[in-house]
Each structure stands twice: as structure tokens, then as C-alpha cells.
Amino acid sequence: MIDYLRGTLTDIDHQYAVVEVHGVGYQVYCPNPYEFEKERDSVITIYTFQYVREDVIRLYGFRTKEKRSLFEKLLNVSGIGPKGALAILATGQPEHVIQAIEEEDEAFLVKFPGVGKKTARQIILDLKGKVDELHPGLFSQKEEQPKPHEKNDGNQALDEAMEALKALGYVEKELKKVKPKLEQETLTTDAYIKKALQLMLNR
């Protein structure tokens, strides 16, 4: 089992980051690969989870052990697969997810792609009271909030963000509702993703 990778971030796709370790490039699927954009061509440490099924072997990666642990706990819930767990973690604010679980807020959880009322209830039943130990690590790793003054190729960054959100399971209909607001700002791809998720989850 691979616990973590430490290597050079060489490429970013809308689903994964490529980390080169001793000449080998590993595809590491992440909730939001673009959160590593500022570290491109730098050495990073990413905590991994190896997912093995008959037809697929993938590495999933996270900035902290706590986020990886939350991902693993979500995978143990009936009805939640890797794609669904990534979508839940992609908000960059996992403490909100934990709060929803502890407060039995099904209305918040069903906003994530692939999570219906039955699955939301199952998440609460399986995880309530079992994620408290993750709080210190999750809360100490505050994500940077979108900064309107950040400069980037707005159209390209927004297009990349839309593709990343589609890969997480968000449908075109949902994305069209928030895209006009995103087009009013010039942000990085990472910031566009976080902003879009905030808009969709706060509706």
C-alpha cells in the first residue's frame, strides 16, 4: 500500500495530477487537481489511497491525511463510490460536510451529484459521530478563498473548471445556472471550481 508520494508535480488534468517520482509519473486522481496549480514543477507531498477493482486500479490523492480518511469513510457508505466521494470533498470545505452529517442535514447532502435522499440518510447513519477525530486536521488546513483580483486566462480557466466539475458528476443544466456569475469574474481554475461549488451548494 502506498501511503504518500513525494515528487515533482509535472502536469494537471481536469481529473488528476501527475506526480513524477524517480522518473515514474503517477496519475493521482484528486477532488480538485487545480488546487495544486501554484505548485506545478515543484516538489509536493500527496497522501494517497489505492483503489483496486477487477477493471480498474487508481491512485486517489489528498493534501492531508484527514481528507484521505474522510474519503475512505465515505467509500464505506453504501451508494457512494470514488467519484461521489471526490465530489463531496471537492468543495474545499470538508468541515461543512461534517457539520451536515452531525446535524443530519439531508438537504445539504443531496446537493452533491449522485446523492439522493436514501444515500444522504445512509451517510448520516453510517458516519454521524465517527468523523469528529478529523476536525483538527480539517479545520487547520483552511483552503484559500477565491480572489477576484487573481489574473489568468479567464476563458481557458473557466473552461477547465467546467470540465473538472463535469468529471465530478455535475450536469450541464446545473453548471449553466452558475456560469453567468462566474463569467463576471477573472479567477484561476481552482478558484472558479470553488466558487461554482459554493454557488451550487448555497442555492
UniProtKB/Swiss-Prot annotation:
Subcellular compartments: Cytoplasm
Gene giving rise to this polypeptide: ruvA
Keywords for this protein: Cytoplasm, DNA damage, DNA recombination, DNA repair, DNA-binding
Domain notes: Has three domains with a flexible linker between the domains II and III and assumes an 'L' shape. Domain III is highly mobile and contacts RuvB.
Family listed: Belongs to the RuvA family.
Family matches, as Pfam families: HHH_5, RuvA_C, RuvA_N
Annotated spans, Domain I: 1-63
Protein name: Holliday junction branch migration complex subunit RuvA
Region annotation Domain II: where it falls in the sequence: 64-142
Broad class of where this protein is predominantly found: cytoplasm
Subunit architecture: Homotetramer. Forms an RuvA(8)-RuvB(12)-Holliday junction (HJ) complex. HJ DNA is sandwiched between 2 RuvA tetramers; dsDNA enters through RuvA and exits via RuvB. An RuvB hexamer assembles on each DNA strand where it exits the tetramer. Each RuvB hexamer is contacted by two RuvA subunits (via domain III) on 2 adjacent RuvB subunits; this complex drives branch migration. In the full resolvosome a probable DNA-RuvA(4)-RuvB(12)-RuvC(2) complex forms which resolves the HJ.
Domain of life: Bacteria
InterPro entries in UniProt: DNA_helicase_Holl-junc_RuvA_I, Hlx-hairpin-Hlx_DNA-bd_motif, NA-bd_OB-fold, RuvA, RuvA_2-like, RuvA_C, RuvA_C_sf
Role according to the record: The RuvA-RuvB-RuvC complex processes Holliday junction (HJ) DNA during genetic recombination and DNA repair, while the RuvA-RuvB complex plays an important role in the rescue of blocked DNA replication forks via replication fork reversal (RFR). RuvA specifically binds to HJ cruciform DNA, conferring on it an open structure. The RuvB hexamer acts as an ATP-dependent pump, pulling dsDNA into and through the RuvAB complex. HJ branch migration allows RuvC to scan DNA until it finds its consensus sequence, where it cleaves and resolves the cruciform DNA.
One term under GO cellular component: cytoplasm
CDD domains (alphabetical): UBA_RuvA_C
Species this protein is from: Halalkalibacterium halodurans (strain ATCC BAA-125 / DSM 18197 / FERM 7344 / JCM 9153 / C-125)
Region (Domain III): 153-203
GO biological-process terms attached to the record: DNA recombination; DNA repair
Stretches the record annotates as Flexible linker: 143-152
Entry's Gene Ontology molecular function annotations: ATP binding; four-way junction DNA binding; four-way junction helicase activity
